[in-house]
Amino acid sequence: MRIDILSLFPNMFQATMGESIIGKAQDNGFIDINVTDFRQYTTDKHNHVDDAPFGGGAGMLLQAQPIFDAMDAIHEQTKDQYSKGRVILMDPAGRKFDQAYAKELAQEDHLTFICGHYEGYDERIRNLVTDEASLGDYVLTGGELAAMVMIDATVRFVPGVLGNMSSPMGDSFSNGLLEYPQYTRPADFRGMKVPEVLTSGNHQKIKEWRMRESLRRTLHRRPDLLKTAKLSREQQLMLEDIKLDEDPTVPD
């Protein structure tokens, strides 16, 4: 997978994109990340990439020309090896990013993230994009941090990056639920003991315990997720049992 990033602050990506899983994924050839400073494509003699909005108003807008020209250059560099893929505009009004969206993006061979700054974008820039994405209902200074989060979450699902693909599939949200509690050695730490089932060696019992605790944790911490989670019949019965255990007055 190739990932292109358009930003006025390319140095912001050096630390996060070069370390840990993402850094190793690049070293091993699973992903190729390229950051373009689109200020280099401005035709303005003062290197301006923004201007006041027509009709007046507060703030400055990113101009279309530098971003269009930067995108043209990326297309020329990649057209023989990669598809256009998805072009994602970071925008607080965009589609809210979640685990399902990350899995979706991981199926592409080419992703391009356009990171804004200032008050917003010239509307014509939206003609370049396939997606408009947001982390949530708040505004950041620029799109760089949001792009980093999206890239980190997406790269985990690119085949080969984590080696054991059961690992991301077990993460919180991957099945619509929060992840179950996990423990490592020692089995007894300051009187806090690991649940006996996890040291029993009974894999079926362990699987059932994990499913139950995943449901329990989701019910307690993110009950909203249960409204959209696609629960099996077994999980539905288990959830009803959990609710009844915790509040016997809950109707069947």
Curated annotation (Swiss-Prot):
It is an enzyme of class 2 (transferase). S-adenosyl-L-methionine binds at G116, L135, G136, D137, Y138, V139, L140. Its EC number is 2.1.1.228. It catalyses: guanosine(37) in tRNA + S-adenosyl-L-methionine = N(1)-methylguanosine(37) in tRNA + S-adenosyl-L-homocysteine + H(+). Pfam families: tRNA_m1G_MT (PF01746). Keywords: Cytoplasm, Methyltransferase, S-adenosyl-L-methionine, Transferase, tRNA processing. Gene3D superfamilies: 3.40.1280.10, tRNA(m1g37)methyltransferase, domain 2. It comes from the Bacteria. One of its GO terms (biological process) is tRNA N1-guanine methylation. PANTHER family: TRNA (GUANINE-N(1)-)-METHYLTRANSFERASE. Specifically methylates guanosine-37 in various tRNAs. HAMAP family: TrmD. Homodimer. This is tRNA (guanine-N(1)-)-methyltransferase. The lineage of its organism: Bacteria, Bacillati, Bacillota, Bacilli, Lactobacillales. The gene is trmD.
